[in-house]
């Protein structure tokens, strides 16, 4: 698959958050891009602090030049495309063990797991062994996108592929993105709230159902059942 790959003269220097942000602020990019990139690195810093239990942290892989390019490049793409929403399908985390600067850990890395605890993204193990989602990737997606279980109905206008550096003979190591037009497509999502009660009067139930309809419920009903100790509910 033909894909775009960005090469950097990567530096593996360990950097503090302040040193990384100083590099970010020197980038030739609009203020909105710089601000978003700063938020992403702050997300990573908070995750690292939570994992290691200290405010004195140094970025290792995340502070390298290629990771900084990943973050600024992603923010610039969002700025130029200016999409209405950015949606992310369930992310494959990978399986097995991984080795980083702090030792060997089960996949996903501790910082990645902490970043996913924001609740904005859906995750799954996936079919491939090894680390499939890095802390940098998790931070970018947590900042710019929201997770969805499946692709919504819409018209695919463009498709883009970004290539990674790992060579997997079984699967192309690319990230795919769709630019879609979903306006005018109907997507009706209904939440259902159910509860069992056996200690309220019929008058109370009737009043509750009426109030629910007044507050915007599509429908409301009460179904009589026989509950414990033979009590009607």
Q: What does each model-identified segment do?
A:
Residues 11, 25, 29, 42-53, ...:
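Generic secondary-structure signature for well-ordered alpha-helical cores
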Residues 1-52, 109, 118-122, 128-138, ...:
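Glycine-rich nucleotide/cofactor/substrate-binding loop typically near the N-terminus or early
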Residues 59-82:
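Conserved phosphate/anionic-ligand binding catalytic regions in large, soluble enzymes, centered on
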Residues 83-183:
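Mobile "lid/hinge" segments at catalytic clefts and subdomain interfaces of large enzymes
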């Amino acid at each position: 698959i033909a894909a775009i790959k960005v090469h950097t003269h990567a530096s593996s220097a360990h950097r503090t958050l302040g040193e990384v942000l100083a590099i970010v602020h020197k980038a030739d990019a609009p203020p909105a891009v710089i601000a978003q990139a700063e938020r992403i690195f702050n997300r990573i810093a908070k995750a690292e602090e939570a994992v290691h239990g200290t405010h004195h942290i140094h970025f290792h892989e995340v502070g390298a030049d290629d990771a900084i390019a990943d973050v600024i490049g992603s923010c610039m793409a969002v700025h130029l495309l200016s999409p209405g929403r950015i949606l992310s399908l369930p992310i494959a985390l990978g399986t097995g063990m991984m080795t980083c600067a702090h030792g060997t850990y089960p996949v996903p890395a501790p910082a990645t797991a902490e970043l996913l605890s924001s609740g904005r993204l859906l995750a799954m193990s996936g079919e491939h062994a090894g680390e499939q989602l890095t802390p940098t990737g998790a931070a970018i997606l947590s900042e710019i996108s929201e997770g969805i279980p499946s692709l919504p109905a819409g018209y695919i206008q463009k498709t883009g592929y970004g290539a990674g550096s790992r060579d997997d003979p079984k699967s192309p190591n690319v990230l795919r993105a769709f630019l879609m037009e979903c306006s005018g497509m109907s997507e009706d999502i209904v939440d259902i709230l159910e509860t069992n009660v056996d200690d309220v009067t019929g008058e109370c139930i009737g009043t509750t159902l009426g109030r629910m309809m007044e507050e915007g419920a599509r429908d409301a009903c009460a179904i009589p059942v026989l509950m414990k100790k033979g009590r009607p509910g």
